Amino acid sequence: MIELTKPRIVTMILVTTVASALIAGSATLTLIDWFWLMIGTALIAGSAGAANQVWECRIDRNMPRTANRPVPGGRMSYAVAVALTASSGIAGSIILWLGNGLVPACVGIATWLIYVLVYTPMKTRTAWNTTVGAIAGALPVFIGYTAAGGTLTELPGWMLFGVLACWQYPHFMAIAWLYRTQYAEAGFCMTTTVEPTGRHAAWQSILGSVALATCGVVLAWFPDGQWVASAASVLATVLILAASWPLLRASLNFRANPNDKTARKMLRWSLVVLPAVLLVMTLRASL
């Protein structure tokens, strides 16, 4: 059951939800608020991941990377997977609504709808699916942000959204390159299958890395939505740029030599850079 929910993605979403709540000002959250926030978010995220697997179960059988997932691998029936998807999604929405408010619940539902009903079918139709997936992947920051008292119109929330959305370009372009043959054979329309030289994937990774750092720097100088010129702003800027540089360098190396080795380095650095930047942003907001 846990494998059905894509636990690595759920973990990443929970980390970003915590960071966004801390940046918004988590003093308003009690321990029980945190509990409901984590449970509700995990259930909705898990439901979205499960729904994605249910939708793509036939295609997943054609990819070695995904053929052993619970449904395509025959370890879980289609009916059980659908039931778990529906029950966890509904439960998560209700928990967020009752435990943290209507806005966090609505953001969670919107995330689910975009990921499942827009992003998932787009994967076999257009390479623009990555952009839609980036939006769906970044929206959960507003679950934590609004649960902690922030609003959907505040600059810090949108800079967090920008960091998460832009980070997904180098991260998923690396994956798309490494599994480009499997994606093509399964019928997925990815940037690396549409443009197999890797040039487009590389430039999207480079621009995503630059935009990620830019959003982080903006938040360093506007920690509460207002311009704050201080030593903390300068220090946060330096740390964010330093933390972001390895991912940009890896993206540039991939652009110069698009191959599996440079793609793997880009993927590995993406897994290091995101938590590092989020940590700096969270610490800056607390000063």
Curated annotation (Swiss-Prot):
<keyword id="KW-0350">Heme biosynthesis</keyword>
<keyword id="KW-0472">Membrane</keyword>
<comment type="similarity">
    <text>Belongs to the UbiA prenyltransferase family. Protoheme IX farnesyltransferase subfamily.</text>
</comment>
<dbReference type="GO" id="GO:0008495">
    <property type="term" value="F:protoheme IX farnesyltransferase activity"/>
</dbReference>
<dbReference type="Pfam" id="PF01040">
    <property type="entry name" value="UbiA"/>
</dbReference>
<comment type="pathway">
    <text>Porphyrin-containing compound metabolism; heme O biosynthesis; heme O from protoheme: step 1/1.</text>
</comment>
<feature type="transmembrane region" description="Helical">
    <location>
        <begin position="132"/>
        <end position="152"/>
    </location>
</feature>
<dbReference type="GO" id="GO:0005886">
    <property type="term" value="C:plasma membrane"/>
</dbReference>
<keyword id="KW-1133">Transmembrane helix</keyword>
<dbReference type="GO" id="GO:0006783">
    <property type="term" value="P:heme biosynthetic process"/>
</dbReference>
<dbReference type="InterPro" id="IPR030470">
    <property type="entry name" value="UbiA_prenylTrfase_CS"/>
</dbReference>
<keyword id="KW-1003">Cell membrane</keyword>
<dbReference type="GO" id="GO:0048034">
    <property type="term" value="P:heme O biosynthetic process"/>
</dbReference>
<feature type="transmembrane region" description="Helical">
    <location>
        <begin position="267"/>
        <end position="287"/>
    </location>
</feature>
<feature type="transmembrane region" description="Helical">
    <location>
        <begin position="202"/>
        <end position="222"/>
    </location>
</feature>
<feature type="transmembrane region" description="Helical">
    <location>
        <begin position="94"/>
        <end position="114"/>
    </location>
</feature>
<feature type="transmembrane region" description="Helical">
    <location>
        <begin position="228"/>
        <end position="248"/>
    </location>
</feature>
<feature type="transmembrane region" description="Helical">
    <location>
        <begin position="9"/>
        <end position="29"/>
    </location>
</feature>
<dbReference type="InterPro" id="IPR000537">
    <property type="entry name" value="UbiA_prenyltransferase"/>
</dbReference>
<keyword id="KW-0997">Cell inner membrane</keyword>
<dbReference type="InterPro" id="IPR006369">
    <property type="entry name" value="Protohaem_IX_farnesylTrfase"/>
</dbReference>
<feature type="transmembrane region" description="Helical">
    <location>
        <begin position="31"/>
        <end position="51"/>
    </location>
</feature>
<comment type="function">
    <text>Converts heme B (protoheme IX) to heme O by substitution of the vinyl group on carbon 2 of heme B porphyrin ring with a hydroxyethyl farnesyl side group.</text>
</comment>
<dbReference type="InterPro" id="IPR044878">
    <property type="entry name" value="UbiA_sf"/>
</dbReference>
<keyword id="KW-0808">Transferase</keyword>
<keyword id="KW-0812">Transmembrane</keyword>
<protein>
    <recommendedName>
        <fullName>Protoheme IX farnesyltransferase</fullName>
        <ecNumber>2.5.1.141</ecNumber>
    </recommendedName>
</protein>
<feature type="transmembrane region" description="Helical">
    <location>
        <begin position="158"/>
        <end position="178"/>
    </location>
</feature>
